[in-house]
């Protein structure tokens, strides 16, 4: 009898240890992406009316996120909830910038991204080191940011929105599609685009087709690529298809086999998405992602074309807050000065 009691005590102890381990794992995972405003409660009706927009605010280019937010908020009557994502050491500065500027009226939540989630998943070598910044991979983890919403918009920080964001949010996603992107071959004014020397618009520019792992995918290198700087995502499908896990798998494969970090496109975050979403995404109206404004400081779009655009994206090295850059006047019209005086424009006349 005493032996049986002792065995039961041991089994009970092991059960408690196991439960504690599971609980710790869940809590630890939850800290990778932590929402400062998780205590805020919202009714189902309020959540239905909200348009969640995720945008990252990196330390060295926080003014970009603020300009993007200003342009979105100023051009719509919709109820926008901004999820502003940053690293721990920038969260107080993000809040100060919003609350001590014209942006104080926006509805927002500040979210901390813990880069520990990326440990062992990123190769250190890249033709563009800035693309290795942790916040560049936030788009992979949208379901850990958005818990209440079925649909979400993700935007890169180097964009300006000139249309009503409600139109972008209303983008139709086909059954079984977790996201919508802009096809690189569907850009308007393609004759202007082709003058941008070195621009990549096919999978060949992002994947290394010399590697067997890439060849085995069976994807033609001439397949049109897409740009993940503007995403309309369905969170239910994203979770159902385990998109985040798939993306992490292709990050890990790149660490082991160097599948795309040396590609012409330099698309460290783009390449895994091209693989995971191949043939399984919906498309965004081309006017809602006019891009490559940061590709070449000597190439300009026509003013009429830019006025028609709903969203402008300065992807590339030449950002509108730096010099040299093009069409920076359009970006500056939405710039919100930094209350702390840290972020400054680098233009000859600024």
From Swiss-Prot:
Topology feature Lumenal, residues = 25-349
Record has Acetylation as a keyword:
no
Give the transmembrane ranges.
7-24
Question: Which of UniProt's keywords are assigned here?
Answer: Glycoprotein, Glycosyltransferase, Membrane, Signal-anchor, Transferase, Transmembrane, Transmembrane helix
Topology, Cytoplasmic side: 1-6
GO cellular component terms? Golgi apparatus; membrane
Note the coiled coil stretches, chain numbering: none
InterPro entries (alphabetical): Glyco_trans_8, Glycosyltrans_8_dom-fam, Nucleotide-diphossugar_trans
GO MF term set? UDP-glycosyltransferase activity
Places the protein is found:
Membrane
Superkingdom of this entry's organism? Answer: Eukaryota
Residues the record marks as carrying a glycan: 234
> Where is this chain primarily localised?
membrane
E.C. no: 2.4.1.-
Top EC class per UniProt? Answer: transferase
Q: Which Gene3D superfamilies match?
A: Spore Coat Polysaccharide Biosynthesis Protein SpsA, Chain A
Whether Membrane counts among this entry's keywords is: yes
Q: How does the record say this protein sits in the membrane?
A: Single-pass type II membrane protein
Give the family this protein belongs to, as stated in its UniProt record: Belongs to the glycosyltransferase 8 family.
- Which PANTHER family does its entry note? GLYCOSYLTRANSFERASE 8 DOMAIN-CONTAINING PROTEIN, GLYCOSYLTRANSFERASE 8 DOMAIN-CONTAINING PROTEIN 2
From the Swiss-Prot or TrEMBL record, give the protein name. Glycosyltransferase 8 domain-containing protein 2
């Amino acid at each position: 009898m005493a032996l049986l009691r002792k065995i039961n005590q041991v089994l009970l102890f092991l059960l408690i240890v196991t439960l504690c381990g599971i609980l710790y794992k869940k809590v630890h995972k939850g800290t990778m992406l932590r929402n400062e405003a998780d205590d805020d409660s919202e009714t189902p009706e309020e959540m239905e009316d909200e348009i969640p927009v995720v945008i990252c605010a990196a330390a060295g280019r926080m003014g970009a996120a603020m300009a993007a937010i200003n342009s979105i908020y100023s051009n719509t009557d919709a109820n926008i909830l901004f999820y502003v994502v940053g690293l721990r050491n920038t969260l107080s500065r993000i809040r100060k910038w919003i609350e001590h500027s014209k942006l104080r009226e926006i509805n927002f939540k500040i979210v901390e991204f813990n880069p520990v989630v990326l440990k062992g998943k990123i190769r250190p070598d890249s033709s563009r080191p800035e693309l290795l910044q942790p916040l560049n991979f936030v788009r992979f983890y949208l379901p850990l940011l958005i818990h209440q919403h079925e649909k979400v918009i993700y935007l890169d920080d180097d964009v300006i929105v000139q249309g009503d964001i409600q139109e972008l949010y209303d983008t139709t996603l086909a059954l079984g599609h977790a996201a919508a992107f802009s096809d690189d071959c569907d850009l308007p004014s393609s004759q202007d685009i082709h003058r941008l020397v070195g621009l990549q618009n096919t999978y060949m520019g992002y994947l290394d087709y010399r590697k067997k792992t890439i060849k085995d995918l069976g994807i033609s290198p001439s397949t049109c690529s897409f740009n993940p700087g503007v995403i309309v995502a369905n969170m239910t499908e994203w979770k159902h298809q385990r998109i985040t896990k798939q993306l992490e798998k292709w990050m890990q494969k790149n660490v082991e086999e160097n599948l795309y970090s040396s590609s012409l496109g330099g698309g460290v975050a783009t390449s895994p998405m091209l693989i995971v979403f191949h043939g399984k995404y919906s498309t965004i109206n081309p006017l809602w992602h006019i891009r490559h404004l940061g590709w070449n400081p000597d190439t300009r779009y026509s003013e009429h074309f830019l006025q028609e655009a709903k969203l402008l994206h300065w992807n590339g090295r030449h950002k509108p807050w730096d010099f040299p850059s093009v069409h920076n006047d359009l970006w500056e019209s939405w710039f919100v000065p930094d209350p702390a005086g840290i972020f400054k424009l680098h233009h000859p006349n600024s």
